[in-house]
């Protein structure tokens, strides 16, 4: 039984529709975002991610983002047990691309802000001003306990206080090249960073809790959130509304970028068959680890990203919104995503990244109203 594609709930003027950005969430960890031995199995390498991002650039994707993961979930698929490091990967990708925006993720418990400020300024130089930083507080305790740097479980309730000080130091150093910031977590004494970035450095976050959205409203340039459900492209809208309301309190414009997985094929039935096959092989041991870790934070409320990731409804792809269908169906659903007010962009993952980006560029994107402004491609990337 196919999921019906819902009718459009929102409408935007044509000129507003053209603003939607498309990004790729590169597979910095093994097997991407499908926790199943029935899905493609692969290790993360620079060459793989280089091919993915160069192909994305060819098809006019606007940005590429890598996460950071320091310990995986185990299981028979060894899910995310094998990971590259985000800043060094994205520095390499910045050097082999020319137009696409590049974002690395800082695990802020592991890197002092002054070091991140300098690394970001370096990649700004490599990329010619195409670099930005995604800041994460850290939710998976074993990632940090293994290195002896977990600050204690009180951190769950203070992590955005920590991140607030962190970003203030970053802004000082990127803005003036100097910081004398004094806080509960950081003390800067005539700290210097030079050269500074050539353009204002973009900071992004992925807060869905009230505290996370309040942080993004004050300090982020845009905020990532999860899509929800299977073939329910506008179900995330209440989250985008909450982000918009939080930003209104600070007088800033902070749009939402929505995370979706695309599983597409010639027909709805063929795409659905792939999705059901992936789900049938779900790695229960790895999923149990995710569920266990999601329960460690008892202080951040029920609306956090990790709570959604561990929901059993569609845990095989950590419950990101999933668009399953023919190329035309997926294009139509992505136009529905773009119709939601304050949804400024979409971050995509694929079951198979190389073929997925190619079919997106050749078969899906040309059907999308919100991408109709793009030039017609004449030559495929190697």
Curated annotation (Swiss-Prot):
Induction: Up-regulated by the nitrogen regulatory protein C (NtrC also called GlnG) and repressed by RutR.
Function noted in UniProt: The FMN-N(5)-oxide reacts spontaneously with NADH to produce FMN. Requires the flavin reductase RutF to regenerate FMN in vivo.
Biological process annotations from GO: alkanesulfonate catabolic process; nitrogen utilization; uracil catabolic process
Family: Belongs to the NtaA/SnaA/DszA monooxygenase family. RutA subfamily.
HAMAP family: RutA
One Pfam family recorded for the sequence: Bac_luciferase
CDD domains, sorted: Alkanesulfonate_monoxygenase (cd01094)
Native species: Shigella dysenteriae serotype 1 (strain Sd197)
Binding-site list for FMN: 68-69, 134, 143, 159-160, 209
Keyword annotations: Flavoprotein, FMN, Monooxygenase, NADP, Oxidoreductase
Protein's UniProt keywords contain tRNA processing: no
Keyword Ligase tagged: no
The EC number(s) this enzyme carries: 1.14.99.46
Catalysed reaction equations from the record: uracil + FMNH2 + NADH + O2 = (Z)-3-ureidoacrylate + FMN + NAD(+) + H2O + H(+); thymine + FMNH2 + NADH + O2 = (Z)-2-methylureidoacrylate + FMN + NAD(+) + H2O + H(+)
Gene Ontology MF, one: uracil oxygenase activity
InterPro entries: Luciferase-like_dom (IPR011251), Luciferase-like_sf (IPR036661), Pyrimidine_monooxygenase_RutA (IPR019914), SsuD_RutA_monooxygenase (IPR050172)
Protein's recorded name: Pyrimidine monooxygenase RutA
Listed Gene3D superfamilies: Luciferase-like domain
